[in-house]
Amino acid sequence: MHDDRTVVEDRLTRLLTDRLRPAVHRVVAGLDVAAWHVPGEPVPPAAALAGGDFQPFPVGGAWGPPWGTTWFRLTGTVPDLPAGSRVELVVDLGWNTASPGFQAEGLVYRPDGSVHKGLHPRNDWVPVTGRAVDLYVEAAANPTILDGFRPTRLGDRATAGEAPLYRLARADVTVRDEGLAELVHDLQVLAELRAQLPAGEPRGHEILRALSRAMDALDPADLSGTAEAARAALGPVLARPAHASAHRITAVGHAHIDSAWLWPLRETVRKVARTASNVSDLLDTHPDLVYAMSSAQQFAWLEEHRPEVFARVAEHVRAGRFVPVGGMWVESDTNMPGSEAMARQFVHGKRYFLERFGIETREAWLPDSFGYSAALPQIVALSGTRWFLTQKISWNQTNRFPHHTFWWEGIDGTRVFTHFPPADTYNGELTGAELAHAVRNFRDKGDATRSLLPFGYGDGGGGPTREMLARARRLADLEGSPRVAVEAPASFFAAAEEEYGSAAPVWVGELYLELHRATYTSQAATKQGNRRAEHLLREAELWCATASVRLGVPYPHDELDRLWKTVLLHQFHDILPGSSIAWVHREAQATYAAVAASLETLISGAVAALAGGGEHEVSFNASPFARDGVPALGAAPPPAVSGVVTVSDGVQLDNGLLRVEVDARGLVVSVLDLVAGREVLAGPGNLLQLHRDEPNRWDAWDVDPFYRSLVSDVDGVTELSVAGDTVRISRAFGASTVLQEITLAAGARRVDFRVEVDWHEQEKFLKVAFPVDVHTDRAQFETQYGHLTRPTHENTSWDAARFEVCAHRWVRVAEPGYGVALANDSTYGHDVQRVPRAGGGTASVVRLSLVRAPRFPDPATDQGRHVFRYSLVPGADVVDAVRAGYELNLPLRTVRGAAVEPLAHVVSSPPESVVVEAVKLADDGSGDVVLRVYEALGGRATATLAPSFAVAGATETDLLERDRERDALGEGLTLRLRPFQIATIRLRRS
């Protein structure tokens, strides 16, 4: 037989495109359209329906300046039609070729203000019952920003302009031909399946012949009348069951809705309502759909802003078909959030689902975050969560991850059962190509037989469609295809763990994403706002709890809850990483300022109450380490400053413990550890280095390895001066200026640095370097509740790919007997390189990433003034590094008043190995005191708690403060902790 595959394929493509799909909706009447262009920001629906100034509007008319809202009123009459006709409006707001969720969208309302249905580019129909049509469409003119990576002013309403972006292309009353629609699905599923089969596979030829027969049976002059004959020709090939060994795919309806990204937070509120409305309609009409939605924040937005949609969602949740997943407040970044913030994502997320729906979510759901902290498995497990899902590691730039289903082991040894969907998408459409790729790509064949595939339009929302569900029904048991079952994620995980749990491989350590490494640095103000807010929250909880226990001052549960949720929202994986539009980051800065002001009010009130006033100064120390005579977590008079810093020409600072030499270029050329008798530096330190930064794509997200060869040192000096114990250096480069300060305080075992940058560069990357005279091939980096060790060599492609990494407050390099730490107050990006050392051996160049200047999606990223603080700590062991990180981020607060005893003393062995991360009152309002501690050194430790208030009992709890079956508390409030173990202790007050 001659090979006519291409002829058949081309014939089918034209048939679907030019004849069948357009014929599914037959126009029977037009609609009258009126429009009201909302001035400014969106208004509540009730206000629009009651007070909108609607004027006649032509189909084809222009509407929608960027970020504007236009309300359309659609009226008309359905003509007489045969009984059983399915009448639908088809509305085209002017869709473009971009994906749904990245352009105009709409939400349809009835005249009484109730929500009817969402409108998206591939979900443009509205069901109609009755003869009269009277509906309103709230249309959002969201601009298409993801169009290459070119700089755009569309990312902020203040700069986006007023020119309309869209034209109303269509508003029709139609009759949907169900027979033709079903034929389209039959043809498409079979054609896509055949395209993925091997060329010599008999099944493919069988399908090809069936497609030819079906097209022969179809009369273009009577498509509707001949559709059944065409379907009959396809029936036998659609009826063939899948092979017994066919891979099994759990298809989960889903819409990945970024809580902010290329749109502001206020638009996400509306996106969630549109998608949830569409999904609710599908659940009503398609009993085979199961839909999963993450992010408690998005449910809360529905509850607050669209309560009628929330009520429908809640009904489907109770039926088990609208499934909350993830157990987090938002799908956050997991690299940069601090210890408590990462825990509170699960506390607030899981508690919301428990309180609203009585549901304990079991699967952590983070398909799109930019790598996953090695501390996460323990945090996940301590929240009562059992499984973990992501897809993002498939984006790796260099190495292909070796597993799709495996146990993930964290820094403390906790393991969680983990799955990466091998379809390599969280926005699946259940196409033949996706399913075939999932099967071919699956790395665990032979031992495991199943995988998960989230399907539905996402990123900007949209969700599953009836077309996707039609495909799923045909793919449930079809020869040549994997078996597709639409199920809840928990069904997949339970079956996968039962099948493969005992044999699944183990991955130890972080799930590092070999991409998007610049997200540790972009949008410095957002990152600084986050870091400051996290530490102010710690202080507020500590001092408010202390004031409540000591003085009976009411504990501000509600205010702290509000502030925590605000901070958690802004840790979303496109806000904290700095990869959103200008609008998002401008608002984030204002929000962080408001959060800080509210927290300062709480802190100052609690501190004033505790201090009680008086003539003498008292310093409050929120750090878990005693400091300058002030106890950890308490307050005492500050000690008199002792010691002398001598300053000599050259410039040289000497406090008897360290001697720091600064040359005429303002560089630190020597840090002599007078106690250890050794030089700390192997070359000039505090050296600013400016890189060209022109990533291949994803400007705000990426820094590519070639940036390292495009570097110049910033060592020109415009002014150098000395004031007291501080050296000040002014520099200028490009369009920017820098003021650096170097301070050696009396009695200090560290050198403090402050750099103020007035930054006006484009596509540049500024780092500060310290060549440390330490020979090692690894470095330690702080993460949540501990630290991890990474190689600093490039022996393998996995090592080389980690050329930019994330750390929290400190990084440390060490050789046996001596270490050096570099602590910071707001920086996350780091790199550590090994370089030859004069005299032999190697040194370690430790660099902090300070500021970037990408142009997409925010063309003005990081322009303006920034202040960074960091400290070099010679002779540092891990405890010294941990202490320096806390002290730099939790400065003493000095007021007038009396000393305050800590609520609890923690005495550990080894000394200071057990760190108090949080002191607060219990969330249930009982007044119990909750302490969260962790082992910080990576070894075993014993800690004794000594409360300074009457305690009726103590229990270990999970992160949600529920008693655990296994209790780490021994007699006498003694804790025995394994390496990096987190323990939450509830102290019940008498």
Regions found by a protein language model. Give the residues of each.
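Extended extracellular/luminal ectodomain segments enriched in beta-structured repeat modules
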Residues: 79-89, 748-749, 926
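Short beta-strands within extracellular/lumenal beta-sheet-rich domains
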Residues: 62-80
